[in-house]
Amino acid sequence: MSLIKLQQITDELEELKYQGEQGIPILIEGRKDEEALRELGVNGPFIKVSGTRLSLSEIALRASRTSRVIILTDFDRKGSELAKRLYRDMQSLGADPDLRIRRRLMGMTRRYIKDIQSLPSYIERLKLEVCPYPLDNI
C-alpha cells in the first residue's frame, strides 16, 4: 500500500514540476511551503498568499495575468477556504485556476498531513515503510 501511495504522490509532484517548468504559477500559502516544494524538486514560479501586503483580490488579479494557475494551498480548513476564494476570484477574471493537483494530493495524504510543508517528511516516512533498511550494504 505504501509503495502505491508513494508512486501516486511522486506522479503528482512530477506533474507539478512539469507545470512549473512551463511557467505556470503555483499559488501557495507561504515561505515554508515554497521551501518544501523546492526540496522536492518543484521550482516553478510561486505566488505566496500569506506574508504579503497584497489582498486576496490583488493576488488573484496578479495570478490571473496568465491563463492558467495552479492553486496548492494547505489541506486544512483555512487552506480550503483560501482555495475556494482564489478559485472564484481568478475564474471571474478569466483565468483557468487548477485545483486538481491539490485535490489529488489532499486525497492521498488527508489522514496523515494537513499542509504542504509536511510533504517532504511524509514522503520520507513512506520511503522507509517501503524499504526500511539501507541498500548501501548490498
From Swiss-Prot:
Cell membrane among keywords: no
CDD domains for the chain: TOPRIM_RNase_M5_like (cd01027)
Binding site for Mg(2+) 1: 29, 74
Cofactors demanded by this protein: Mg(2+)
SMART domains: TOPRIM (SM00493)
Residue stretches making up the Toprim domain: 23-105
Alphabetized UniProt keyword annotations: Magnesium, Metal-binding
Cofactor binding notes: Binds two Mg(2+) per subunit.
GO terms of molecular function: metal ion binding
HAMAP family, sorted: UPF0292 (MF_01095)
Similarity comment text for this entry: Belongs to the UPF0292 family.
Protein's name in the database: UPF0292 protein MTH_890
Lineage: Archaea, Methanobacteriati, Methanobacteriota, Methanomada group, Methanobacteria
